[in-house]
Curated annotation (Swiss-Prot):
<feature type="transmembrane region" description="Helical">
    <location>
        <begin position="4"/>
        <end position="24"/>
    </location>
</feature>
<dbReference type="GO" id="GO:0030964">
    <property type="term" value="C:NADH dehydrogenase complex"/>
</dbReference>
<comment type="similarity">
    <text>Belongs to the complex I subunit 4L family.</text>
</comment>
<dbReference type="GO" id="GO:0005886">
    <property type="term" value="C:plasma membrane"/>
</dbReference>
<dbReference type="GO" id="GO:0048038">
    <property type="term" value="F:quinone binding"/>
</dbReference>
<dbReference type="GO" id="GO:0050136">
    <property type="term" value="F:NADH:ubiquinone reductase (non-electrogenic) activity"/>
</dbReference>
<comment type="function">
    <text>NDH-1 shuttles electrons from NADH, via FMN and iron-sulfur (Fe-S) centers, to quinones in the respiratory chain. The immediate electron acceptor for the enzyme in this species is believed to be ubiquinone. Couples the redox reaction to proton translocation (for every two electrons transferred, four hydrogen ions are translocated across the cytoplasmic membrane), and thus conserves the redox energy in a proton gradient.</text>
</comment>
<dbReference type="Pfam" id="PF00420">
    <property type="entry name" value="Oxidored_q2"/>
</dbReference>
<keyword id="KW-0813">Transport</keyword>
<dbReference type="GO" id="GO:0042773">
    <property type="term" value="P:ATP synthesis coupled electron transport"/>
</dbReference>
<keyword id="KW-1278">Translocase</keyword>
<keyword id="KW-1133">Transmembrane helix</keyword>
<keyword id="KW-0472">Membrane</keyword>
<feature type="transmembrane region" description="Helical">
    <location>
        <begin position="66"/>
        <end position="86"/>
    </location>
</feature>
<keyword id="KW-1003">Cell membrane</keyword>
<keyword id="KW-0520">NAD</keyword>
<dbReference type="InterPro" id="IPR001133">
    <property type="entry name" value="NADH_UbQ_OxRdtase_chain4L/K"/>
</dbReference>
Amino acid sequence: MIPLTHYLILSGVLFAIGLMGVIVRRDIIVIFMCLEMMLSAANLSLVAFSRAQGTMGLPNYDGQALSIFILTIAAAEVAIGLALIVSLYRARRTASTQDLNTLKD
């Protein structure tokens, strides 16, 4: 059985990579993908904690159920976010965050 710390370290590394992508990158689609990576890292830690909390040898499935619910909500978020990004690209012919300031005009 893999220890809980390995899952949490992996989750932390994935979250840090996603956070760095959000901070450093300028392309909206890449930022969106990094946000989804951060959400997946949070789901991984949630499932890992749920697995480690099992009582009397039986696994606790609360974390898995919540993770599936979060993934369902994230799918709707992806659909709406990509629709907004495509709409922005059609209007401005760019997907860079530096050009978003022109939306104020």
